[in-house]
Amino acid sequence: MDQAKQDELKKAAAKKAAALVEDGMVLGVGTGSTVKFFIDELGKKKAAGLTLKAVVTTSSRSQKQLEGYGFTVSPLSEVDQVDLTVDGADRVDKQLNGIKGGGAALTLEKNVAVNSKKNVWIVDESKVVDHLSGFALPVEVLPISCMQVEKRLADEGLKPEFRLTEDGQRLKTHYGNYILDLKLDRIPVPSGLADYLDHTVGVVEHGLFLNICDQVIIARDNGEIEVRSR
């Protein structure tokens, strides 16, 4: 499929997600190529009179785009709860569980998501899988114990690798931590791995988003827009 056709599908999915946004909401906005089109749709709705109580976002790129449309972006700490968050995902399975954090913003993404009444992901068909696989699982770790965590994960057969910058340095997250990418072919029991990582000292957060997403809007290659709900 050529890029122009793929973009048209993403725009259609973004428009469907934008239809869920209502006046007076506290809205969470993620990042990614499809979310970019969602923000464009928000801009149209704002021009038509949409008013939001607050907007929070998970990336500086989305913040800049939102502000370009006249939205004021607030930090998560300044809102009690988010009514709706629209974001992308790196992978999503049949149970609407997903892998996120390819952009290294997993800690903020998960904090926004778990503090949202409803989470909607918009993705293209390439992100949809039967079982979580085909994408490295990011794990954010504290620098002070990163080597110990790496060894512990390696001993468990989880194949950790430090994510590096273009010049070969360890990539630092917004919070000054490192990312270990788990190069797993497949995650057979996501809940078990999530529980293990949750209880590993030195792990700040991981990219398994389980029982968080309420609805996925999928741009299919055949031109259809599919909606799956939990």
Curated annotation (Swiss-Prot):
It catalyses: aldehydo-D-ribose 5-phosphate = D-ribulose 5-phosphate. It is an enzyme of class 5 (isomerase). GO terms for molecular function: ribose-5-phosphate isomerase activity. One of its GO terms (biological process) is D-ribose metabolic process. One of its GO terms (cellular component) is cytosol. Its EC number is 5.3.1.6. Substrate binds at residues 31-34, 87-90, 100-103, 127. It comes from the Bacteria. Signal peptide: none annotated. Pathway: Carbohydrate degradation; pentose phosphate pathway; D-ribose 5-phosphate from D-ribulose 5-phosphate (non-oxidative stage): step 1/1. The active site is at 109 (proton acceptor). InterPro entries: NagB/RpiA_transferase-like, Ribose5P_isomerase_typA_subgr, Ribose5P_isomerase_type_A. Keywords: Isomerase. Catalyzes the reversible conversion of ribose-5-phosphate to ribulose 5-phosphate. Belongs to the ribose 5-phosphate isomerase family. PANTHER family: RIBOSE-5-PHOSPHATE ISOMERASE. Homodimer. This is Ribose-5-phosphate isomerase A. It comes from Lactobacillus delbrueckii subsp. bulgaricus (strain ATCC 11842 / DSM 20081 / BCRC 10696 / JCM 1002 / NBRC 13953 / NCIMB 11778 / NCTC 12712 / WDCM 00102 / Lb 14). The gene is rpiA.
